[in-house]
Curated annotation (Swiss-Prot):
GO molecular function, one term: O-acetyltransferase activity
Motif position, DXXH motif: 479-482
Disulfide bonds: 153-204, 175-240, 184-484, 400-480
Membrane-crossing residue ranges in chain numbering: 55-77
Main subcellular location: Golgi
Annotated membrane topology: Single-pass type II membrane protein
Any Pfam family hit: PC-Esterase
Originating species: Oryza sativa subsp. japonica
Upper taxonomic lineage: Eukaryota, Viridiplantae, Streptophyta, Embryophyta, Tracheophyta
Protein name as catalogued: Xylan O-acetyltransferase 12
Length: 503
């Protein structure tokens, strides 16, 4: 290295001295002639002498500095390369250790038994760190909401976690398509804690709802919710979850009798709700005027309803509330034949028997008419009511009014929720499997059982606002069946989103 430096200095010394160069500068006229511009003018020639200064001490020092800079740069690059290789080796070793430690831990995750997070630590820094970690898990999961190495994740088993950073998913006051019957904060409910609970499955994560991806999934397609007012509750939730992401003037709500349509023109997508509380044709088919206590279904008539939803790309049925007894000894009528043909016959049956008749007719129709290569079918589980506060140690006169916390009893089940009806639905829909038609059950019942705090009660408007006398009588007028929005139905739709996008 040093011999190269001295050789360089000797070469510099040889070039030292004074050099004289003579530059001949032609006048503009001469330059014009050279370019072919012939003018009768004399050519003027100017001479200029340029002197180059000798390369002295300053030049030598400059060369030395430049040389040392080059040598230092090469050495630094070599050192950094060695450091990078060492860091890579350490990182690979740590990654292997983490993988070995995580293998037994993945099995332990599913063994969690707690339903709720301790209230005293919900707002603590530790809770925030845990939530951030969970978000990272969701963002990097394998797509089905499960942990690595787990083939199936049961989203319906888990706990409610208070989360004031990512909940609610939207503002009920800003959703322009919300219905007054579930707009609780609009009608005077001041506590908003019910909006900030997030459902956390045991041992896995529920995929986060992405409205833009969901709308893209619905591009040129139609999603239909078919059922009663609880299903309409879920439909309103879905509309509120996506409408904020659609520009004004590019969305619309259309009423057409029993059909309500939300249209997203940007995507040529439609999200419908169709009123059909008993699934078959019945005396309750009018979405506004219908008799609740005296119910009649036509056992062999479904075509009028089916013509509305059979060509949809995605269908979400529900049917539970209207099959429940409103009083002891309540029954219903099943009609066979028609009065027009003169063969009408009415049978009186138990409510649950009518439910089975309706599901079998629906299944028969789906098996014969649905396009299994196009349409995906879902059936929402039973939505529990919280009308009897004594079930959790409260006052029945208030029903679920003034409740601000979920029920913190693991695996809590209300005595009024009929789980056998869902078992019957699974059994009946299972007969479609040999035909290649799968009805996916949205198992929403258990997670909803905990949420006694999430109903509209008196904070709602049903056609007309409640009077002062009605507000003062919650035992009759508090709605503990439907759900405030934002709220529990948002999680139902997260289930639907997860199935549509990841399974």
């Amino acid at each position: 290295m040093w011999s190269a430096l001295f050789s360089h200095l000797r070469e510099v010394h040889k070039r030292s001295g004074v050099k004289e160069e003579k530059l001949i500068m032609k006048s503009p006229a001469a330059a014009g002639e050279a370019a072919g511009c012939h003018k009768p003018q004399a050519t003027a020639t100017n001479k200029m002498t340029v002197l180059q200064s000798p390369l002295g001490l300053r030049t030598i020092l400059t060369s030395l500095v430049a040389f040392f800079i080059v040598v230092s740069s090469v050495s630094l690059l070599f050192d950094r390369s060695q450091d990078a290789q060492a860091q890579l080796a350490v990182a690979q070793h740590q990654h292997q250790e983490v993988q070995l430690k995580q293998k037994p831990a993945s099995a332990a995750v599913g063994e969690q038994k707690s339903v709720f997070v301790d209230q005293s630590s919900l707002r603590s820094q530790e809770a925030q760190v845990q939530w951030t970690s969970e978000l990272q898990d969701v963002a990097t999961d394998s797509g089905d909401g499960g942990v690595d190495g787990e083939e199936e994740c049961n989203w319906s088993l888990g706990r409610w976690v208070y989360d004031n950073s990512s909940r609610p998913l939207y503002s009920g006051l800003k959703c322009s398509f919300i219905f007054d019957e579930v707009a609780c904060d609009k009608y005077g409910r001041n506590d908003t804690k019910y909006q900030h609970w997030r459902w956390q499955p045991h041992g896995c994560n529920l995929p986060r709802f992405n409205a833009t991806k969901f709308l893209e999934k619905l591009r040129n397609k139609r999603l239909v919710f078919v059922g009663d007012s609880v299903n309409r509750n879920q439909w309103v939730s879905m509309v509120c979850m996506v409408e904020h992401f659609i520009p004004d003037g590019r969305k619309m709500r259309v009423y057409n009798g029993s059909l309500i349509s939300f249209k997203a023109f940007e995507y040529n997508a439609t999200i419908d709700f169709y009123w059909s509380p008993l699934l078959l044709e019945s005396n309750s088919d009018n979405p506004i005027i219908h008799r609740v206590e005296y119910r009649i279904i036509r056992a062999d008539r479904i075509e009028k309803h089916a013509n509305v939803w059979k060509d949809a790309d995605f269908i979400v049925f529900n049917s539970y509330l209207w099959w429940r007894k409103q009083r002891d000894g309540m029954t219903m009528k099943v009609m066979y034949g028609s009065f027009e043909d003169g063969d009408a016959k009415l049978d009186e049956v138990e409510m649950v028997d009518g439910y089975e008749i309706a599901l079998k007719k629906l299944t028969e129709y789906l098996g014969a008419n649905i396009n299994k290569n196009k349409t995906r079918i879902f059936f929402a589980g039973s939505s529990p009511a919280h009308s009897w506060a004594s079930n959790w140690g409260g006052d029945d006169n208030n029903k679920c009014l003034n409740e601000t916390e979920p029920i913190q009893i693991e695996d809590y089940r209300s005595a009024t929720t009929d789980y056998g009806m869902m078992d019957k639905a699974k059994e009946i829909f299972g007969t479609l499997e040999p035909k290649g038609i799968h009805v996916q059950i949205l198992n929403i019942t258990q997670l909803s059982e905990y949420r006694k705090d999430a109903h509209p009660t008196i904070f709602r408007r049903q056609y007309v606002p409640l009077t002062k006398e009605q507000i003062a009588n919650p035992s009759i007028y508090a709605d503990c069946t439907h759900w405030c929005l934002p709220g529990v139905p948002d999680v139902w739709n997260e289930f639907l989103y997860a199935y549509l996008m990841h399974k």
